[in-house]
């Protein structure tokens, strides 16, 4: 049978647990002793996990099944960017900085105020924490991201799965971690969410009629952010709320230089992203209040963290 942990299982930070790597859908639990085993594993009632191609038990039993063996991927997500964002969204808080997706979702809900709370969309949702947070307050929430790897994590969590991932400690050393909505108090409203892979600059027509659109740390990662901003009003109901958060870290790897919204000289004057937002959104939106800064921390290794301030602006659709 497949090998997995009990729901209450947790690794101890001090104990070097050698069982967690076997929770990967590649190990089978084999009952009985093994001729190469000593100690507890040699007992008749022992249980231990072995990869299917190991030959320790070749002389004991041979089982042939008519059921095709499905090829399984590792249950532990190891993609560096995905694991960083899993920890960013669902892991521990560092340096007394509150969880960013949760804090931003609460800010967005407050910005909507007494307006309709029917439908919301999180554009650039990554692995989905803000989507689940918004689902506590909206009847339907859609998370859209360009990366299928990110979306897969949100889909698995919404399904009720435990998503296991590793975080880098030092060199090749990693720590095994897991995320589950029930542990965060988010499972009761998970049925309200949907995840879609999509391009914020070229959204399908179905993504319309929202009371709230959240664009978190998105615009400075788009290949044509002005195109997105020119058309975003078409996705919102009249009177709907648009919340944009960004550290404005413009990089040519993500956005061609001629598509940057700000961070350069224009007509001899400093032109900032906020100036561009006001110019591009002014026809259909009114900015509510003043911009505010929301901090976030992304863990890279045990001793290396990114500490960033994201500027948050709130806009109401007026035309």
Language-model features, listed with the residues they occupy:
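Conserved Class I S-adenosyl-L-methionine
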Residues: 170, 255-290
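A short glycine-rich, Lys/Arg-flanked "PGG" loop and its adjoining helix->strand segment in the class I
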Residues: 226-238
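Conserved SAM/SAH-binding beta-strand->alpha-helix loop
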Residues: 147
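Conserved alpha-helix/loop element of class I SAM-dependent methyltransferases that forms part
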Residues: 95-117
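S-adenosyl-L-methionine
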Residues: 159-201
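Conserved beta-strand signature within the Rossmann-like core of class I S-adenosyl-L-methionine
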Residues: 239-247
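A short acidic, Gly/Pro-enriched loop at the edge of an enzyme's catalytic core
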Residues: 201-213
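Surface-exposed recognition segments
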Residues: 1-68
